[in-house]
């Protein structure tokens, strides 16, 4: 029988939490109720879902999807996020599941793929968090006390879709990667 349990696939022996079951049920309901998303959602599933507090009373739902299903999710990202936010009343962010591999030991002939380095994983998570906006610039500012603040400039074309979520983006990224990030839109220079 086809149920909402098929929409969440976790590691062997790990049971989904109650919150993850509700997210999987929302996916299942969207697939059965929404005709325009039905064919796109048919083969898609999620790995995990976490709920986190954002500035103020708002909450965010971070949904981890398998890395190889990243492209199909991005194809329907805007519609899917709109529907899930309407149902839940929370900000929804999709992030691909990535794995960091420790650097190889001295003298080891094993090569570590670039996609498995800490830097590449954190950059990938950053791109996933701000999607559908694109990152057009990045500045790192070091404060006098040694703290590091990263300024991310987003594409102004997607301002209408993403401006209300900027605090959510920075809170989610801080929770996932432990780095302080400020999101801005570059000021257009008029000649």
Swiss-Prot record:
Cell membrane is among the record's keywords: no
GO molecular function: structural constituent of ribosome
This protein's UniProt keywords: Ribonucleoprotein, Ribosomal protein
One GO cellular component term noted in the UniProt record for this chain: 90S preribosome
Family: Belongs to the eukaryotic ribosomal protein eS7 family.
GO biological process, one term: translation
Name of the molecule in the record: Small ribosomal subunit protein eS7
Coiled coil region boundaries: none
Gene that encodes it: RPS7
């Amino acid at each position: 029988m086809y149920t909402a349990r098929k929409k969440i696939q976790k590691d062997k022996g790990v049971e989904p939490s109650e919150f993850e079951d509700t997210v999987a049920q929302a996916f299942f309901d969207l697939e059965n109720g929404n005709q325009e998303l039905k064919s796109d959602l048919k083969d898609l599933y999620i790995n995990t879902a976490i709920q986190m507090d954002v500035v103020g009373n708002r909450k965010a739902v971070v949904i981890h999807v398998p890395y190889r299903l990243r492209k199909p999710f991005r194809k329907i990202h805007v519609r899917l996020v709109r529907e899930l936010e309407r149902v839940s009343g929370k900000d929804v962010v999709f992030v691909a599941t990535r794995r960091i591999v420790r650097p190889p030991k001295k003298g080891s002939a094993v090569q570590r793929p670039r996609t498995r380095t800490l830097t590449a994983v954190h950059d990938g998570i950053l791109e996933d968090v701000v999607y559908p906006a694109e990152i057009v610039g990045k500045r790192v500012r070091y404060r006098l006390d040694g703290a590091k603040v990263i300024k991310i400039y987003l594409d102004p074309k997607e301002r209408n879709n993403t401006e209300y979520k900027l605090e959510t983006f920075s809170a989610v990224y801080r929770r996932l990667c432990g780095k302080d990030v400020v999101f801005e839109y570059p000021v257009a220079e008029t000649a």
